[in-house]
């Protein structure tokens, strides 16, 4: 078998090689380049949306300081109170027009209870301002056996400081029983009520 000659000579092959255009590698698509970069998350977690701890702490401290200031300015402590057992007798006729009118509709006990409730409220204010020391302590009572047997009993809560002041005035030696002291206190409260009533009507 014979050797075939190349169709192109060496010189022609070199000229063809020089005339070929250079192979240009295409650049990567933009989408491909961008896909290699880290993308920010589309949705933030709840922890990412929370405020910075330092800011939250400052806000909490400010609110707490405001609350402490308000509490310091307001007094929420109620005064200590004590229960006092009270008793009183109805007044004699014409001592109190209010009582005389009430017994036309209610029993003597019920009528005196209605007045005593009001009298004790007023007398508590007198204990607070000290005016009870110059006020009357008693009033005329009936002399009949039936009317003497009527005794109204009740109880009321008083501030301890006011009861101490009343005891020093009505029982300076501290020898009275609790019920005896309560009778004096209720009698004085009614005496003040009847005295004011008479002064208003005169």
Curated annotation (Swiss-Prot):
SUPFAM superfamilies, per database record: Ribbon-helix-helix
Molecular functions (GO terms): DNA binding
Annotated keywords: Crown gall tumor, Plasmid
Entries under InterPro entries matching the protein: Ribbon_hlx_hlx, VirC2, VirC2_C_sf
Lineage: superkingdom: Bacteria
Pfam families: VirC2
Stretches for region Disordered: 21-66
Listed GO biological process terms: regulation of DNA-templated transcription
Extra facts: The Ti plasmid contains at least six transcriptional units, designated vir loci, which are essential for efficient crown-gall tumorigenesis.
Protein name from the UniProt record: Protein virC2
Organism of provenance: Agrobacterium fabrum (strain C58 / ATCC 33970) (Agrobacterium tumefaciens (strain C58))
Upper lineage: Bacteria, Pseudomonadati, Pseudomonadota, Alphaproteobacteria, Hyphomicrobiales
């Amino acid at each position: 078998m014979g050797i075939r000659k190349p169709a192109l000579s060496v010189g022609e092959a070199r000229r063809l090689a020089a005339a070929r255009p250079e192979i240009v590698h295409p650049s990567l698509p933009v989408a491909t380049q961008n896909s290699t970069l880290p993308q920010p998350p589309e949705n933030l977690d709840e922890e990412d949306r929370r405020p910075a701890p330092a800011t939250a702490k400052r806000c909490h401290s400010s609110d707490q300081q405001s609350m402490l200031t308000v509490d310091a300015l307001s007094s929420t402590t109620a005064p200590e109170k004590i229960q006092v057992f009270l008793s009183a007798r109805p007044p004699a006729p014409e001592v109190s027009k209010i009582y005389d009118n009430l017994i036309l509709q209610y029993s003597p006990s019920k009528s005196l209870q209605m007045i005593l409730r009001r009298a004790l409220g007023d007398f508590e204010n007198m204990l607070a301002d000290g005016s009870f020391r110059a006020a009357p302590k008693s009033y005329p009572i009936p002399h009949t056996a039936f009317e003497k047997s009527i005794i109204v009993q009740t109880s009321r809560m008083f501030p301890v400081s006011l009861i101490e002041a009343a005891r020093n005035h009505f029982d300076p030696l501290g020898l009275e029983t609790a019920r005896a002291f309560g009778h004096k206190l209720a009698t004085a409260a009614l005496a003040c009520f009847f005295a004011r009533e008479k002064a208003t009507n005169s």
